[in-house]
């Protein structure tokens, strides 16, 4: 896998790096217009989700919490965007895997009647096994397949033809291929953000073409009024993080295989709670894809998991069940937590510059 130089790749890993160093690095390795456009699209999608799903329904103390996380999330987005890397052309294998992931998930859920969260675990586990060392898939190909799998949970039927699902899978693979190594590097759960953006685009295209409002992902996420989602979201993030960093398990496999096991146990022991608690776990696992330059320790990964769970406690509105909502919310939690970590330990741009300079300039996260 070829390296993609970052905006600070020429800097030494020095904690004394300055704002001037960052400006110089940005001028030398500035993100391409495509990178900035994709970043803006992600910001619009995440902003719409946050305002419609959280801000408009918060009051009192909840509103203060949502405002704080929103401000931190915006700061985290800015810090991530200015350290984004030049974009590259999409790879055919990434686009193909996005399509295959969507088709496979669609066959499992709609043709074979497999429960949604089980389909997520099965599809992701297969993709993850293929991305093991010496396997045929690298990280970006497996991530594209995972993103396509989430978009494949769009429901076809009388008002949404199979063709829209195929378009969603192709778009997810295409976007992930370009976003992965370039846009918001190191930010966790971008797979979910890409799935949410892709699902939104397909939803709008279907409406503009005269199709009635298409059904959405049938995972109930409104009114997650069980505080159990806080520890479950944190546990999902931490278990996945440990598997990645202690056993060198590929991210997609580390996310999907435990999700399959956990949701299977829940289906036996607590069948009525699977949609809520299982969704909390799956969304939490996506946080573990954050790079160490953003969330460097297990403490910050766990904190992002708690923030994610706290956000989902207050989610509601017309976007309930929209493809990628859980992952997009996890992305917001990652950016907010990364900004908090930077404020606590950085206080200026120097340490962030040094961290990005030390981070491998490869699409590993």
Show where each model-derived region lies.
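Short helix-coil junctions and helix-kink-helix linkers
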Residues: 110, 245-246
